[in-house]
Amino acid sequence: MLSITPKSKTLNILDKIIFSCLILYSLTFLLDIKINFLTTAFVFGIIKLIFIRPQVRINSKIFYLILLFILCTFLSIVFNDVSSFSLNNISTFKSRFISPLLGIFIIFIYSFNKYNINKLFIGFAFSFFINALAVIYQFFNGDIISYGTRLTGFNNSYMLLCAVNLLILPILFVLAIHKSNISYKLRLLYLITIFVNIPAIIFENTRIVYLGIGIVFPLIILFSIKNKYKAIIFIILFSLYSYACFQISPTSTQRFSNITTTNKNDFSNYQRILMWESSLKMFIDHPIFGIGVGNWHEQYTTNYTPPIKTGDFYHPHNVLLNMLSETGILGGISYLLLFLYLYYISIYNYLKKQDIFSLAYISSLLAYTINCLTDSMFCGHNIKSPTTLFWLFTGFYLILNKYVIISYNKKDLNK
């Protein structure tokens, strides 16, 4: 049995502070507040390294692929033939690609396990539950007239809400309905959270979320419920519930019906096509290193302006085209390799073990990939938190499947 020393006592206090910050982060990540509790937790983790160094064993190639991805994106800043090397491009690169990695590196400075990770998802579920109630209240209060077609609850960015909906709700849904040793009360909490969020998602009027949830949730049901008759009944009930919610909101019904519209009748879709065409031209003109990270907006508004004026956009609302246009074939391939590897290890583990963690991660990864078709990952500054969350959940998955094993020397604890 370990004796309690001043050092072990200090480490215990630091661990409690770190976990408290993580809980606060899960409860506040949707709010526009000055304090980022995930960053605060990371800072205390760095302080913890002063007292003890973890023993790290990595059983995955993921960090090599992350390094390759970061290197290839950085090369676009140095070697692109559009702009010279500048601090502004470095700042954009840091905000979009470096800072969010805090989410995955925090696993090296705190001992995560399935119990404390589950506690964090209770916090995420509570945040989604409260925000969904706020969205529903806004809808029935008629706030859609004041705020336009996008309702966001306590959040102030529909892009952020869109991304986290597709990142986190699939995980909560898997935890709710997949047979596991999670307690009945917790599964009920997650299921109620999903139940309340369905109308909220519909009233938020973000079509890629309709598409992502509409594809991923039925798949989750089919893979989680072994009795296929029950699974089909569940899917039918889910569809009827969603249909009923759409009938309450004519605006949402119209938004849904325009998902596949590609002409000028739906300018939101049409301008995306124009941006995609411009991005493809950028890639064709600058195939190796692209136009450089942070240069898309300037090139789009000066050299690749579409025939019809669109909004003042800073990315093309498609991650692959964004990577190809800004970082060329090197960045595009490194991005694809990274995500293909994540799909490979998670699908391989699920087929091998049928475990709930792999199914939850695959579901989140698939939904987020769908989001990346018309929205953007690797956004910087005020909307970089979805990328941080993506890396955080990837870190959780690596820990839970022992791709990363963190341990501490007992002698160091007793010094």
Describe the residue ranges of each PLM region:
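Transmembrane signal-anchor hairpin modules in multi-pass inner-membrane enzymes, especially those
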Residues: 1-88, 102, 109-122, 175-188, ...
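Loop-to-helix entry and N-terminal half of a specific, functionally important transmembrane alpha helix
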Residues: 17-25, 64, 189, 193, ...
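Transmembrane alpha-helices of multi-pass inner-membrane enzymes
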Residues: 19, 42-47, 170, 361-415
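Alpha-helical transmembrane segments of multi-pass inner-membrane proteins
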Residues: 23, 102, 115-146, 156-225, ...
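Hydrophobic transmembrane alpha-helices and their immediate junctions
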Residues: 54, 63, 222, 229-231, ...
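Aromatic-anchored transmembrane helix interface
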Residues: 62-68, 86-110, 128, 132, ...
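Long extracytoplasmic/lumenal interhelical loops at the membrane interface
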Residues: 144-145, 263-277, 285, 289-327
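A membrane-periplasm/extracellular boundary helix in multi-pass inner-membrane enzymes
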Residues: 224-264, 277-285, 293
